Amino acid sequence: MSVQGPQRRLLGSVNSTSPAAPRLGLAANQTGPRCLEVSVPDGLFLSLGLVSVVENVLVVAAIAKNRNLHSPMYYFICCLAVSDLLVSVSSVLETAVMLLLEAGTLAGRAAVVQQLDDIIDVLVCGAMVSSLCFLGAIAVDRYISIFYALRYHSIVTLPRAWRAISAIWVASVLSSTLFIAYYDHTAVLLCLVSFFVAMLVLMAVLYVHMLARACQHARGIARLHKRQRPVHQGLGLKGAATLTILLGIFFLCWGPFFLHLSLMVLCPRHPICGCVFKNFNLFLTLIICNSIVDPLIYAFRSQELRKTLREVLLCSW
């Protein structure tokens, strides 16, 4: 990543005599002796990345194989899996190259490694932006399917879905390129943080509204069966728990990374903020964990997809 010094891992590996120069002027000793730094072993990071790669490859393969899954909703889920796959592959590739450089197995000039690092950074940033976009697209798709059920297939058509998907990928590539090129501009960081907040608010509003509609529907059914309280309370608790898990995981996995970006704008030289900066690799690990959890939340809950997944695993193409 290109947002702050210690995470420029490839360049730091080439010049082992001196650590990579921190970006935005953060001093190496600025964080003080009392900072809590959570170290993520490279083996654990690689293992999580590989698990994410396998999961998301299976999701893409299952959707590609089953024509019944060739619908806008599953195309959004497939693109989310591709985004998570790119995040994991890029992170694993960067870590693997860094380990090979440190071990002396791989030799490279600083200029070459700089170019490789920039390419990986663009992939990671673009995949992160597209992942957030497709999470929002899935929320919008589900919202339309509930509140405009009779008109859903006329609103969410395949051409419109493909246009939305194309726009998301183009915007992700352009924004990630600009982010890497102008990483030291405050406006770029503020745009990324604002984008995350917008996606969080969008998902929260849509899913809360969907939960309210589900509870309202349950109350109507309960009145007909004269079992209002048990049915309504049971569905309300289940829906609230699902909503809490969905938004909680999203915020837990993505929030620390964007907190890091926010603090880079607000207090890049403050010792307390420096303590947060030292845990950047932990924040990347949480994003990898999100790439592992996404298929469980959005893909594997589908019975049709699970059935196809079993066929894929049994190689019955």
Swiss-Prot record:
Q: Which SUPFAM superfamilies match?
A: Family A G protein-coupled receptor-like
**Where is this chain's protein located in or outside the cell?**
Cell membrane
Annotated keywords: Cell membrane, G-protein coupled receptor, Glycoprotein, Lipoprotein, Membrane, Palmitate, Receptor, Transducer, Transmembrane, Transmembrane helix
Keyword Transmembrane assigned to the entry: answer is: yes
What mutagenesis or variant effect is reported for I63V?
Answer: In strain: Isolate Hya36
Residues carrying the lipid (S-palmitoyl cysteine) are C315
Q: How does it sit in the membrane?
A: Multi-pass membrane protein
- Is Transmembrane helix there in the keyword field? yes
- What is this protein called in UniProt? Melanocyte-stimulating hormone receptor
From which organism does this entry originate?
Puma yagouaroundi (Jaguarundi)
